[in-house]
């Protein structure tokens, strides 16, 4: 609801509102988008994302894990970036329905949480509040590909996973989040694997430069609220679905 209100005010005032979805400015991400747009993957019918860690709950007990302050856990902290990246690369498909489950398991007993390192540990409060999701799973139907994901700040798994699979009927891509990608294809009766090499630009710098251009030209960029709002709607639908234990229609 807050994102929708921001969008409403931006429209009413004629202001440009860009959201901090920095992956839209990443070099690898834009190469992937170009390949999809050019039809190199054929029909991209499914996309899968995995963003899971063994123990990565940030600032446990503090604002990160207090729903009244953060709005949510893994899905809002990590999932937002994966989902937005997917929508961008796939040409902004319209989300139709979502089904998901959000779990509050490994961190809810704060003093029993075992870890070896913690991001933002200086904000942790062992007598604080933990009422957000530390793992989440979901599936989204769109008017393009289906999207499924598994995410976790903390799960009892051996190794962290941070990748996205774009699955097409001609080829597929595995993108290592904030890294490069591998293209899997078929040609002349052969299964091919290629790992493109390229020089990457700093996506934060590209994001800032793009916004400066918006200020000068008054034109909206690829991170405009009207594009980024879809991810907020998906996340809300996943949380609603988890509470209702059923699929939810996305307006």
Ranges and model annotations:
Residues 191-200:
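C-terminal "lid/loop" region of Rossmann-like NAD(P)-dependent oxidoreductases
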Residues 3, 28-29, 82-83, 205-209, ...:
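A general structural signal for well-ordered alpha-helical segments in protein cores
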Residues 17-20, 148-150:
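Short catalytic-loop micro-motif centered on adjacent basic/acidic residues
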Residues 13-16, 23-128, 245:
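Predominantly a Rossmann-like dinucleotide-binding segment in NAD(P)-dependent oxidoreductases
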Residues 84-180, 206-219:
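Contiguous beta-strand/loop segments that form the cofactor/metal-binding neighborhood of enzyme cores
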Residues 140-144, 185-190:
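Short acidic, glycine-rich loop/turn motifs
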